[in-house]
């Protein structure tokens, strides 16, 4: 007698994941990777957790967010045409409405492109490129009868300048008199220079005197000097003096050690950023990097290397965190610790531009723009090497003050790491689960081990075969650390992925899925 045979039962397997490997938006996102993320964090890696809160510390009520800078005593920023210090407008200081470059030395902050200086401790400001024009009297300071002059007299000519300033004269009909000279003394309305500086004595009309300042596009402070770059040129100030950019003093031994310095690097393209590191200053173009060596103008030199530079609109992305320089390059986020830069952003899976960045000491926060006209705030954890994506926060600048990280957007200045997360909307979407097999499978159940704050909730959903439809499994309310099993209506599929959406603060400690094989595709 022939008896029917029953089909062999397909094996049931259970896979438990406790290591969530951060954000990975590539098509080949591995099992365990997180393909999409909103308001997540790698702080508790290998666990997944939601990000800390943010607080709008200084609301500005709209206006162009033009730059944020940290100084002793607080935060300095520009919104529209107004300069603010710790939330208070600087009375009388009206700037051009546009992005700012800040640098500070000795308590004096320089602001480009306005070429304004500001002293936060005194609340004073002025032009960093003062100028005077009019008729001058060229004379000799010793009242002798020589033919050449060393002094310039005119009403008000002394007001904009200081003893020791290097000032530039223009307007002379005798070309040899046009040039830059150092003021040796000021006697009332008389500027005194080196003997026989000018070719003749007498009155001269239409003369302009200026203490010049370069129009920098990027700037930083290192070794008691401000360093700046633009186009193909690098400058630094006189040692200890943020207002002296063309002070080229020399003696019998050559250029003095305190003199200013500048150089044209002579390569195509414009500088796109600079930064001070523990070992020196680095200047970058999109396709190259220059490191500064030397201790004084006589031995300063820039050594070039063909390496990943800074993306042309990402000069604000250069940040030193954990003794490493991070920045957005044309090929994506990169880092260097003194050697050749390496890419670290392949997991982001997209091209990024217009980056601005900051650090809280261990994490690098990057706000950048993608080709789909979307903004993202990505966070790179320097300890674990994992990425996370927070949201669409569009920061124009970051600053760190008293150990806290701040960022500026059109609504004002935000403090990171504080504030309520009770209404925080978050999302985690896994990559495709294929369970190491090209055959079909059926998902039988999902088990989550969660920890959530009071008032928080998490909803789980599944999608099959990339059909765009999410099937809700269950919603889990807040609670202490616990496991929750979610039943699934089995469905034969080639692959599937899971999505967790939450409100409030929560952590995912493990994700277990029970599956059975469902035979090959036909």
Regions found by a protein language model. Give the residues of each.
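Beta-sheet repeat architectures centered on beta-propellers
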Residues: 1-74, 309-316, 320-324, 331, ...
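Beta-propeller and closely related beta-pinwheel folds
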Residues: 55-59, 212-225, 229-358
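Blade-loop segments of beta-propeller domains
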Residues: 63-67, 71, 80, 84-106
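Short loop/turn segments that connect beta-strands within the blades of beta-propeller domains
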Residues: 71-72, 79-80, 105-106, 112-114, ...
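Hydrophobic or amphipathic alpha-helical targeting/insertion segments
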Residues: 100-135
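Beta-strand initiation motifs
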Residues: 126, 200, 255-257, 297-303, ...
